[in-house]
């Protein structure tokens, strides 16, 4: 399977459970922080404590990453770095320690994956990058991210080690110089066992990464494992830590592992994601949806539109109806064969089609810069899914418009949950429509 396939090879059900709750973080501990949009940024310069030097990047090329990484990024469909990536990557690739708080969906995994791959000069039989996290599922996911971004770096070997599987299999991987990983991802308990038994050597580690660091450093047993592993690595290395939440109490604990880190705290991830997005709802009956959708597509200016429905069957039916009404559309959902789904994804991304009907397969992880209109034909089941859906039309602060159809009591409940979660009062769509300058770049 290609990595492009991997990008959109999700079932609809898998995408219903994602945590996008808002967080509020206090200013950086050293008191000398710079505010950048919804971020608090401080430190990161070895010669001048408390200063911040950054660049505003419109594309990943501005980071001067390896050409092989840029090719992989393009293949994955990512066109612009998120604000967290803009702040962290330029400093991180200079070997500066990083402490970053950012919720899932803001691209923090890509920060350390791209940084470590850019810096890595793989030596056969040597582990140079060590990444730890608190669950097997997250470890496996991170390993897949390394595979995705290292597709044009054939000499880079990555392995994942975690409990619940026979340790002998891990030992076999580490006993063979051909399979010995340059990048190791795993959970603290299993990694500590491999280090203690002298199966895994960390004497050449140049980057030490903790994802969801507060989860590991809060628990005494896990913290002990992390500390023992840390002591097995060289003193001169880069340390990067990331988490969804970083309390005032845990930050000093994290910084004990670091030297004057760049500190990045997202004040409110929901504001960051939805900034620049005009959001409205329309109350109507189920029977009125098709007529209203036709009216909107006729009257609104847009570059590309994505229309979300709740099932593959409804996606096919709506796609057929739109084409019958002379709106050339495509449907993307888990019921479409993998080969056909890739073909349709490319058609949409390359602007050969302007209208896409989708389930939550397209609800997250797809960054297509021309989408500036998102319509919830069927409102999602929860506020988290809403955030990921409408974020397609307001990626990383660009302008966009979202319109949600509210047709029953359950929809009204979800609408109230959305307003409560994101601390906004969504207005009803005005009868006279909206000014295109408010959502067209």
UniProtKB/Swiss-Prot annotation:
Its EC number is 3.6.4.13. GO terms for molecular function: ATP binding; ATP hydrolysis activity; RNA binding; RNA helicase activity. Keywords: ATP-binding, Helicase, Hydrolase, mRNA processing, mRNA splicing, mRNA transport, Nucleotide-binding, Nucleus, RNA-binding, Spliceosome, Transport. Residues 89-264 form the Helicase ATP-binding domain. It is an enzyme of class 3 (hydrolase). InterPro entries: DEAD/DEAH_box_helicase_dom (IPR011545), Helicase_ATP-bd (IPR014001), Helicase_C-like (IPR001650), P-loop_NTPase (IPR027417), RNA_helicase_DEAD_Q_motif (IPR014014). GO terms for cellular component: chromosome, telomeric region; spliceosomal complex; transcription export complex. Residues 23-32 have a biased composition (Low complexity). One of its GO terms (biological process) is transcription elongation by RNA polymerase II. It catalyses: ATP + H2O = ADP + phosphate + H(+). Gene3D superfamilies: P-loop containing nucleotide triphosphate hydrolases (3.40.50.300). Coiled coil: none annotated. ATP-binding RNA helicase involved in transcription elongation and required for the export of mRNA out of the nucleus. SUB2 also plays a role in pre-mRNA splicing and spliceosome assembly. May be involved in rDNA and telomeric silencing, and maintenance of genome integrity. This is ATP-dependent RNA helicase sub2.
């Amino acid at each position: 399977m290609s990595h492009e396939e991997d990008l959109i090879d999700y079932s609809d059900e898998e995408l219903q459970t994602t945590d996008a709750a808002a967080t509020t973080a206090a200013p950086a501990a050293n008191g000398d922080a710079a505010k950048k949009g919804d971020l608090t940024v401080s430190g990161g310069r070895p010669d001048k404590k408390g200063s911040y030097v950054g660049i505003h990047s419109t594309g990943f090329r501005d980071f001067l990453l390896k050409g092989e990484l840029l090719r992989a990024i393009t293949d994955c469909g990512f066109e612009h770095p998120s604000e967290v990536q803009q702040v962290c990557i330029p400093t991180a690739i200079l070997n500066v320690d990083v402490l970053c708080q950012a919720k899932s969906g803001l691209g923090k995994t890509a920060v350390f994956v791209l940084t470590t791959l850019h810096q890595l000069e793989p030596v056969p039989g040597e582990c140079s990058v060590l990444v730890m996290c608190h669950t097997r599922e997250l470890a496996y996911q991170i390993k897949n991210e390394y595979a995705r971004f290292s597709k044009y770096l054939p000499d880079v070997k990555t392995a994942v080690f975690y409990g619940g599987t026979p340790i002998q299999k891990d030992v076999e991987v580490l006993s063979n110089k051909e399979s010995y990983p340059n990048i190791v991802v795993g959970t603290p308990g299993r990694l500590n066992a491999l280090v203690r038994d002298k199966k895994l050597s960390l004497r050449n580690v140049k980057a030490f990464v903790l994802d969801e660091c507060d989860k590991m450093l809060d628990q005494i047993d896990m913290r002990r494992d992390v500390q023992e592993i840390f002591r097995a690595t060289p003193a001169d290395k880069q340390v990067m830590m990331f988490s969804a939440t970083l309390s005032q109490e845990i930050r000093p604990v994290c910084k004990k592992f670091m030297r004057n880190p760049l500190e990045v705290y997202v004040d409110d991830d929901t504001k960051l994601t939805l900034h620049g997005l005009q959001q409205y709802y329309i109350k109507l009956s189920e029977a009125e949806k098709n007529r209203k959708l036709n009216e909107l597509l006729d009257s609104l200016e847009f570059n590309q539109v994505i229309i979300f429905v709740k099932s593959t069957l409804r996606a096919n039916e709506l796609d057929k109806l739109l084409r019958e009404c002379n709106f050339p559309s495509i449907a993307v959902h888990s019921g479409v064969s993998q080969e056909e789904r890739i073909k349709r994804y490319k058609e949409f991304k390359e602007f050969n089609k302007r209208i896409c009907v989708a389930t939550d397969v397209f609800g997250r992880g797809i960054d297509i810069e021309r989408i500036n209109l998102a319509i919830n034909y069927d409102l999602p089941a929860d506020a988290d899914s809403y955030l990921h859906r409408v974020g397609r039309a307001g990626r990383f602060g660009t302008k966009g418009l979202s319109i949600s159809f509210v047709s029953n009591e359950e929809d009204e409940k979800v609408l109230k949950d959305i307003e409560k979660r994101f601390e906004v009062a969504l207005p009803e769509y005005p009868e006279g429509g909206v000014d295109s300058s408010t959502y067209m770049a």
